[in-house]
Amino acid sequence: RVLRVGWCAVLGNTPETQWPVFGSSGLPETPPEHLDFLPLSGPVALDPEADWVPDAWQQLDTKLAAAPLGAIGKVVLVGRPGGPDFRPSEVARLGYLAGIVATVLVR
């Protein structure tokens, strides 16, 4: 395994993006009202208590990380309900994996 997550969403890399462009089966039904963490320029562990994070996600203690999908204008957002926090090595792996996926998508 590269990293353990409960769900994944693909978004546009702008704050005005629709929620989500694509999402996994475990994606929470409660969408964020706004996406203040966008745009992203690199992989990052996100603050799970930020204003944009829905209360339902916070109640589940969902840890969040995201990475841009190369230069295709998309971002992958992953959630881990119940934690633990994403380690820096996991965030780096997410960025590396997102780069590979972006390379495949543009071909």
What are these regions (language model features)?
Residues 81-85:
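A generic structural motif
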Residues 86-103:
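Amphipathic alpha-helical "output/dimerization" segments
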Residues 1-2, 6-79:
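GAF sensory domains
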Residues 105-107:
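Signal-transmission linkers at sensory-effector interfaces
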